[in-house]
A protein has these predicted regions:
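Tryptophan-centered motif/residue detector
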Residues: 22-23, 38, 69, 84, ...
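A non-catalytic alpha/beta surface segment that caps or lines the substrate-entry region
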Residues: 30-78, 82, 104
């Protein structure tokens, strides 16, 4: 049983590190001073999709911010499932209202606070 608990803790740590890496990316789409981070975040997501088992990914450039597409075909006869989401976040202003630096996630008790 202790081996299972050790492995579970190792996996938890690994996944938390990956999540925190993502939460640290200041992908604020509404503020042009963060635009380079939108590209950084798109690339990060594309790589994570591949690591998670997607067969392929593509980043589509647009007049705005990039679109990240990932595909996993298990069987062409199966129905297509679309997962649509966004990877941008709200602007951190006003900074004086934050209890800790924005884009520096912390764990309080059992909750993750991406602040």
């Amino acid at each position: 049983m202790s081996t299972v608990i050790t492995l579970s803790e190792e996996e938890k740590s690994k996944y938390l590190n990956e999540l925190f890496e993502f939460l640290k990316l200041p992908s604020v789409s509404a503020d042009s001073k963060f635009s380079k981070y939108m590209n950084t975040t798109a690339n990060w997501l594309s790589n994570e999709l591949l690591k998670s088992g997607c067969d392929s990914t593509k980043i589509y450039e647009t007049n705005g911010h990039p679109i990240v597409y990932g595909e996993k075909i298990i069987n062409p006869s199966y129905p297509t499932i679309l997962v649509y989401g966004h990877y941008d976040v709200q602007p951190p202003d006003p900074l004086e209202l934050w209890n800790s630096p924005p884009f520096e996630p912390i764990i309080k008790k059992t909750d993750i606070h991406p602040e």
